[in-house]
Amino acid sequence: MSGIALSRLAQERKAWRKDHPFGFVAVPTKNPDGTMNLMNWECAIPGKKGTPWEGGLFKLRMLFKDDYPSSPPKCKFEPPLFHPNVYPSGTVCLSILEEDKDWRPAITINQLFIGIQELLNEPNIQEPAQAEAYTIYCQNRVEYEKRFRAQAKKFCPS
């Protein structure tokens, strides 16, 4: 593992614990020996207030490569979401998560979460990742909103 990646992730964790957006969760996983694994985080993003996603808490895994922050983390909803910019595998399709597009090493975990939360409510129809969600979003917005309201209810924290 890269010392640069681990150092940056330790800084990110410290900053996150000190100050993060209300309702968001980001916790490094544990290795089998009980030590913290900074390369694999279990996260959750709340649905934005005043949107059909409100009330939902959407679980996301962030996986960091050894060359982080030169390369972005992989962000994957678990379980996958019905959304035009979420691949059927759960992987998020967002330009700031793509090395050859808008990723910059200065982007923080906090900024990634805000970007993903915005994407939930405002899909980018220029970059669809899921055909069914994209088609319904474009052709029948009422049905689309009904489906993701149901999804938000399904992912309500207990």
UniProtKB/Swiss-Prot annotation:
Top EC group: transferase
Domain (UBC core) ranges: 4-157
Similarity comment text for this entry: Belongs to the ubiquitin-conjugating enzyme family.
Residues annotated with N6-acetyllysine modification: K65
GO molecular function terms noted in the UniProt entry: ATP binding; transferase activity
Disulphide-bonded residues: none
Record's subunit section: Forms a complex with SENP6 and UBE2I in response to UV irradiation. Forms a tight complex with RANGAP1 and RANBP2. Identified in a complex with SUMO2 and UBE2I, where one ZNF451 interacts with one UBE2I and two SUMO2 chains, one bound to the UBE2I active site and the other to another region of the same UBE2I molecule. Interacts with SETX. Interacts with HIPK1 and HIPK2. Interacts with PPM1J. Interacts with RASD2. Interacts with TCF3. Interacts with NR2C1; the interaction promotes its sumoylation. Interacts with SIAH1. Interacts with PARP.
Protein name: SUMO-conjugating enzyme UBC9
Cell location: Nucleus; Cytoplasm
Catalytic residue list: C93 (glycyl thioester intermediate)
Modified residues (Phosphoserine): S71
Site positions per UniProt: Interaction with RANBP2: I4, V25, L57
The protein's role, per its UniProt record: Accepts the ubiquitin-like proteins SUMO1, SUMO2 and SUMO3 from the UBLE1A-UBLE1B E1 complex and catalyzes their covalent attachment to other proteins with the help of an E3 ligase such as RANBP2, CBX4 and ZNF451. Can catalyze the formation of poly-SUMO chains. Essential for nuclear architecture and chromosome segregation. Necessary for sumoylation of FOXL2 and KAT5. Sumoylates p53/TP53 at 'Lys-386'. Mediates sumoylation of ERCC6 which is essential for its transcription-coupled nucleotide excision repair activity.
Gene Ontology cellular component annotations, sorted alphabetically: cytoplasm; nucleus
Positions bearing the Glycyl lysine isopeptide (Lys-Gly) (interchain with G-Cter in SUMO1) cross-link: K49
Stretches for region Interaction with SUMO1: 13-18
PTM comment: Phosphorylation at Ser-71 significantly enhances SUMOylation activity.
Keyword Mitochondrion: no
Site (Substrate binding): residue numbering on this chain: D100, K101
